[in-house]
Amino acid sequence: MRYSKYFIHTLFEVPKEAETPSHILLLRGCYIHPVAAGVYSLLPLGHRVAEKIKAILREELNAIEGLEVTMPVLNPAELWKKSSRYYDIGQELFRIKDRKDREFVLAMTHEEVITDIARQFLRSYRHLPVMLYQIQTKIRDEARPRAGLLRVREFFMNDAYSFHPDFADLDAYYPRIFNAYLRIFTRCGLTTVPIEADSGIMGGTGSHEFMLESPNGEDRFVVCTQCDYRANTEKAQGLIPPVKYSGDAPPPMEAVPTPGIKTIADLMRFFDCPEDRLLKTVAYEADGELVLAVIRGDFSVSATKLANHLKAVKVDFAPEKSLSARGLHAGFLSPVGLHGVKIVCDASVTGPAPFVAGGNAPDVHYRNVVCGRDFTPFDAADLAEVRDGDRCTRCAEGILRIRRGIELGHTFKLGTKYTAAESMDATYLDAAGNQQRVVMGCYGIGVERLMASAVEQWHDEGGMSFPYSIAPFQVILCSLGRKPEILEAAQALYERLGAHYDTIYDDRDESPGVKLKDADLLGVPIRVVVSQKLLQKGEVEIKVRRTGVVIVCPRDELLETLERIVADLQPSFEGLPFMPE
């Protein structure tokens, strides 16, 4: 491919709307073009990268007996109503009507459609297990698209769905997809951290996210300094040291006037107590029901953990009007003396220690409040957001450190969420002729997100540095100068290189500086240069984009030298945390 005939229009200026490295560089390198907020066209270079990622996905999923399908983006609303997702999902789901006023949705995932297929065809134990996957457009009405391809409204997703006769078979299959994902990300040049993930209201018996550690990531996860514990902060637990209290039975609870006390710091000074002796009461609405979450003052409530414990679809902070209707006052909330309100306590507040709590009235607090004596919670659970520096629950020795990351993929033991009788009702007949419920797993990877993540991990001040396996071209050939002998030699090299490598030849009538800077910006892994000086010596110059190493070799040894370089650019699977299969 000749550069002069290709669709490449690089930008020198940084686009004002771009902030993250991948967004800036993919725009500057003419890989993508914005159409609307969170909607991008993949230009020829970006399309080539996406297609190479898709090829890796297909190779690895086919290797574990996956079968590719294509499902429609336009789904009848009836299917989504059967699974309840039509009602459970908020504004991020596009809902539309056709000219006959029939309701449809634009699919953000395809559990409903694939389960409908399964219940029609997978009717016998002889048909199971099976894994079906697709690489298809997904559409989500993201409230705040950001960071270029990292959070968009339309994208390609590889979503896979496995169907099993029982949970044991799903458990046996799960390591195969987990390991395939590790190979996919490694082949794409990405350093991945598999972490334990939150299963949410979906239930099931296991879930993992695959994270790329990045300061531009939206997700947070913890890593233990001593053991292999890795978990999303929505799931992670830290060891919570109990409140030190060794006195006699606490004195009776008493109300104390606290005029002008508004903050935690004010309370600590007023009552002369540490933060862990305060009760923090946070009001939520869980599927429309008022719930009070009670936690120690030195911790914060995780809304995700609360939702999971309550098996609630939607949990939000309770609005002021909801509190006012019950005579409650934000800032002075307390679990004491309330009736008809569900109270869930974090495990950190159970025990004999007395606490300071709100008085459920303006400018009043209670002192010497004891859980179980002065109020009775509906339930106790782990509600605490993990903190950087907490002790590890897995080994009890290590310290948990919080990292930021980009979620590359998610594997999930879905169970019977969609195959249950109250949902899509997918069953089969076992060997004895008895009807059984189909068990599912679901798995997903965003294609454009992998592209952007590769740039986030592999870039420098000069531009991108794409991994060899997914780069739009493997080699870029630059001819420096317009003398006939240079162009003739470059043409000969282009033909030789093109027979072995995916090559683009920069044949433009541009200065050496422009060509070399563009080569760095585009991130092609290997650059080969022909110039007058090199030609006189019968040599060519090779630069490895990733390392910056420059090699000058005889022209007749070019292919042999490239072979060694390419071997060094291949991914290594050594040390990856594969699951036993």
Swiss-Prot record:
InterPro entries: aa-tRNA-synt_IIb, aa-tRNA-synth_II, aa-tRNA-synth_II/BPL/LPL, Anticodon-bd, Anticodon-bd_dom_sf, Pro-tRNA-ligase_IIa, Pro-tRNA-synth_IIa_bac-type, Pro-tRNA-Synthase_IIa_type1. It comes from the Bacteria. Keywords: Aminoacyl-tRNA synthetase, ATP-binding, Cytoplasm, Ligase, Nucleotide-binding, Protein biosynthesis. Its EC number is 6.1.1.15. Transmembrane segments: none annotated. GO terms for cellular component: cytosol. Pfam families: HGTP_anticodon, tRNA-synt_2b, tRNA_edit. One of its GO terms (biological process) is prolyl-tRNA aminoacylation. It is found in: Cytoplasm. Its main location: cytoplasm. One of its GO terms (molecular function) is ATP binding. It catalyses: tRNA(Pro) + L-proline + ATP = L-prolyl-tRNA(Pro) + AMP + diphosphate. PANTHER family: MITOCHONDRIAL RIBOSOME PROTEIN L39/PROLYL-TRNA LIGASE FAMILY MEMBER (PTHR42753), PROLINE--TRNA LIGASE (PTHR42753:SF2). Catalyzes the attachment of proline to tRNA(Pro) in a two-step reaction: proline is first activated by ATP to form Pro-AMP and then transferred to the acceptor end of tRNA(Pro). As ProRS can inadvertently accommodate and process non-cognate amino acids such as alanine and cysteine, to avoid such errors it has two additional distinct editing activities against alanine. One activity is designated as 'pretransfer' editing and involves the tRNA(Pro)-independent hydrolysis of activated Ala-AMP. Belongs to the class-II aminoacyl-tRNA synthetase family. ProS type 1 subfamily. Homodimer. Consists of three domains: the N-terminal catalytic domain, the editing domain and the C-terminal anticodon-binding domain. This is Proline--tRNA ligase. It comes from Syntrophobacter fumaroxidans (strain DSM 10017 / MPOB).
